[in-house]
Amino acid sequence: MTLGGLKPEVHAANDEIRQVVAKVADELKSKLNTTEVEPVSYKTQLVAGTNYFIKVKTPAGFAHARVYKDLQQNHSVHSVKADGITEESEIVYF
């Protein structure tokens, strides 16, 4: 595996990503001011750990979340982007 750039492949949400979102659900809900988040699709970036760029569905629409998993397997929400995100929006680095 190479370190660095965001991988171009978009993957449908799977059990691994649902678990990642579940681990940070409260933080995501707070940052997005919502009561529900459901992962839809994602991309990854290998760094000193893994960045997950996840498209999530909320009652208000869609958002992108950047979740970091460090080498000790701790998860945290790095950032979220909701403005202008639609179901068709490409997942890009932010």
Curated annotation (Swiss-Prot):
It is found in: Cytoplasm. A motif (Secondary area of contact) lies at residues 45-49. Coiled coil: none annotated. It comes from the Eukaryota. Pfam families: Cystatin. One of its GO terms (biological process) is response to bacterium. Keywords: Cytoplasm, Protease inhibitor, Thiol protease inhibitor. The record marks 5 as: Reactive site. GO terms for molecular function: cysteine-type endopeptidase inhibitor activity. GO terms for cellular component: cytosol; phagocytic vesicle; vesicle. Its main location: cytoplasm. InterPro entries: Cystatin_dom, Cystatin_sf, Prot_inh_cystat_CS, Prot_inh_stefin. Intracellular thiol proteinase inhibitor. Inhibits papain, but not cathepsin B. Belongs to the cystatin family. This is Cystatin-A1. It comes from Dictyostelium discoideum (Social amoeba). The lineage of its organism: Eukaryota, Amoebozoa, Evosea, Eumycetozoa, Dictyostelia. The gene is cpiA.
